Every structure is written in structure tokens, then in C-alpha cells.
């Protein structure tokens, strides 16, 4: 024990600066000094090191616990997302079938509507043709009637003399008088 104490005492007596020497005494060298320093450090630092390690252990355990909770939440969300995906796929398939059926219905409705529009257009065309024919027939009749009237007037004017003209007027006047008497 005396050597250990001597080694500590010798620490107080360092050689002066600028000199360097090699100490070959095993008891006075570094391995013993180091073991003492390490012993003191272990004895006094054990509590601090245990506290540090316990804190680190708690943080690691908390991190693991949080990770497990997050993992559980993520698995739960994944299952919910998968269920929603299945539901959406089912609805999409049903929607696709309904849309196909509705598209076919719309196509048939459009075909029927187009056919009806074509029928209406054909009827309108036929009505327009009939109207134009009636108008043309009416115009022809008016022209024929006007020409007949002109011809009759020309014939009457060429055949009528004053005497015939006066007799016609007198006959018409008598006719009107008799009509007037009948109405009174």
C-alpha cells in the first residue's frame, strides 16, 4: 500500500518542465495510476452512469411503445383503408354497370328521339309541300278566275250596247226591289 501512496505522492513532484524521462518502475507507472483513477471513476460515476443509462433505457422504451402504438394505429388505418377500397371497388363496379345500362338507355332514347324528330321533320316537310301546293292551286284558280272575268267583261263590253245595258240595269234594280220587299 505504501507504493500506491508513494505513487500518489510522487504525482505532486513532477520533474521540471522541459525534461522528459522514461520511468521503468512498474509500480510507479501508468497502469496502476490508471486503475486507481478508473476505480474512483467507476465508484463515483456508477450512479451517474446508471442514471444516464436508465434515462436512455426509458427513452428507448417510450420510443418503442410509441412506435408500437403508431404501428397499431397504422395497421388499423390500413384495414379501414382496405375496407373503404373494397367498398369503393364494389360501388365502382355497380356504378360502371349502372352507367353502362344508363348509357344504353340514353342511346335508345336518343335513337327514338332522333327517329321522332325525323318523323316530325318529314311531317313538317309534307305539310309544307301540301301548303305550297294548296297555295299554288289557289293562285292558279285566282288567275283563271281573273282571266275568265276579264274575258267575260271583254265579251260583255263588246256585245253590250246601250239598250242592252239599260235593260240589264233595270232588271237588276227590279230584282233588288223584290228582294227588299221580301225582307220587309
UniProtKB/Swiss-Prot annotation:
<comment type="similarity">
    <text>Belongs to the ATPase B chain family.</text>
</comment>
<keyword id="KW-0150">Chloroplast</keyword>
<keyword id="KW-0406">Ion transport</keyword>
<dbReference type="GO" id="GO:0045259">
    <property type="term" value="C:proton-transporting ATP synthase complex"/>
</dbReference>
<keyword id="KW-1133">Transmembrane helix</keyword>
<keyword id="KW-0793">Thylakoid</keyword>
<keyword id="KW-0375">Hydrogen ion transport</keyword>
<protein>
    <recommendedName>
        <fullName>ATP synthase subunit b, chloroplastic</fullName>
    </recommendedName>
</protein>
<comment type="function">
    <text>Component of the F(0) channel, it forms part of the peripheral stalk, linking F(1) to F(0).</text>
</comment>
<comment type="subunit">
    <text>F-type ATPases have 2 components, F(1) - the catalytic core - and F(0) - the membrane proton channel. F(1) has five subunits: alpha(3), beta(3), gamma(1), delta(1), epsilon(1). F(0) has four main subunits: a(1), b(1), b'(1) and c(10-14). The alpha and beta chains form an alternating ring which encloses part of the gamma chain. F(1) is attached to F(0) by a central stalk formed by the gamma and epsilon chains, while a peripheral stalk is formed by the delta, b and b' chains.</text>
</comment>
<keyword id="KW-0472">Membrane</keyword>
<keyword id="KW-0066">ATP synthesis</keyword>
<dbReference type="InterPro" id="IPR002146">
    <property type="entry name" value="ATP_synth_b/b'su_bac/chlpt"/>
</dbReference>
<comment type="function">
    <text>F(1)F(0) ATP synthase produces ATP from ADP in the presence of a proton or sodium gradient. F-type ATPases consist of two structural domains, F(1) containing the extramembraneous catalytic core and F(0) containing the membrane proton channel, linked together by a central stalk and a peripheral stalk. During catalysis, ATP synthesis in the catalytic domain of F(1) is coupled via a rotary mechanism of the central stalk subunits to proton translocation.</text>
</comment>
<feature type="transmembrane region" description="Helical">
    <location>
        <begin position="27"/>
        <end position="49"/>
    </location>
</feature>
<dbReference type="GO" id="GO:0046933">
    <property type="term" value="F:proton-transporting ATP synthase activity, rotational mechanism"/>
</dbReference>
<keyword id="KW-0934">Plastid</keyword>
<dbReference type="GO" id="GO:0009535">
    <property type="term" value="C:chloroplast thylakoid membrane"/>
</dbReference>
<keyword id="KW-0813">Transport</keyword>
<keyword id="KW-0138">CF(0)</keyword>
<dbReference type="Pfam" id="PF00430">
    <property type="entry name" value="ATP-synt_B"/>
</dbReference>
<keyword id="KW-0812">Transmembrane</keyword>
Amino acid at each position: 500500500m505504501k507504493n500506491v501512496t508513494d505513487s500518489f505522492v510522487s504525482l505532486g513532484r513532477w520533474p521540471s518542465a522541459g525534461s522528459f524521462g522514461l520511468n521503468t518502475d512498474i509500480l510507479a507507472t501508468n497502469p496502476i495510476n490508471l486503475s486507481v483513477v478508473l476505480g474512483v471513476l467507476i465508484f463515483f460515476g456508477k450512479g451517474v452512469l446508471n442514471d444516464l443509462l436508465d434515462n436512455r433505457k426509458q427513452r428507448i422504451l417510450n420510443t418503442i411503445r410509441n412506435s408500437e402504438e403508431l404501428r397499431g394505429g397504422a395497421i388499423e388505418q390500413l384495414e379501414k383503408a382496405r375496407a373503404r377500397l373494397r367498398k369503393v371497388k364494389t360501388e365502382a363496379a355497380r356504378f360502371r354497370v349502372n352507367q353502362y345500362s344508363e348509357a344504353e338507355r340514353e342511346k335508345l332514347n336518343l335513337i327514338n328521339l332522333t327517329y321522332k324528330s325525323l318523323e316530325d321533320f318529314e311531317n313538317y316537310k309534307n305539310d309544307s309541300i301540301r301548303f305550297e301546293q294548296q297555295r299554288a292551286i289557289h293562285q292558279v284558280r285566282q288567275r283563271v278566275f281573273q282571266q275568265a272575268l276579264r274575258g267575260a267583261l271583254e265579251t260583255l263590253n263588246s256585245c253590250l250596247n246601250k239598250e242592252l245595258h239599260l235593260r240589264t240595269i233595270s232588271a237588276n234594280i227590279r230584282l233588288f226591289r223584290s228582294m227588299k220587299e221580301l225582307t220587309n
